[in-house]
Amino acid sequence: LVPMFLSKLICFITKKC
């Protein structure tokens, strides 16, 4: 499981939300 802040970081970097 990935922490929420990490998910948001991935979202920000990949621009896929």
UniProtKB/Swiss-Prot annotation:
Q: Which UniProt keywords apply?
A: Amphibian defense peptide, Antibiotic, Antimicrobial, Disulfide bond, Immunity, Innate immunity, Secreted
Answer yes or no on keyword Disulfide bond.
Answer: yes
GO biological process assignments: defense response to bacterium; innate immune response
Q: What is its main location?
A: secreted
Disulphide bonds in the chain: 11-17
Q: Where in the cell is it found?
A: Secreted
Q: Which GO terms describe its cellular component?
A: extracellular region
Record bears the keyword Secreted:
yes
* Tissue-by-tissue expression: Expressed by the skin glands.
Q: Which domain of life does the UniProt lineage start with? A: Eukaryota
Protein family (similarity comment) = Belongs to the frog skin active peptide (FSAP) family. Brevinin subfamily.
User: What does this protein do, in the record's words?
Assistant: Antimicrobial peptide.
What protein name does the entry list?
Answer: Brevinin 1Tc
Q: Which organism is it from?
A: Rana temporaria (European common frog)
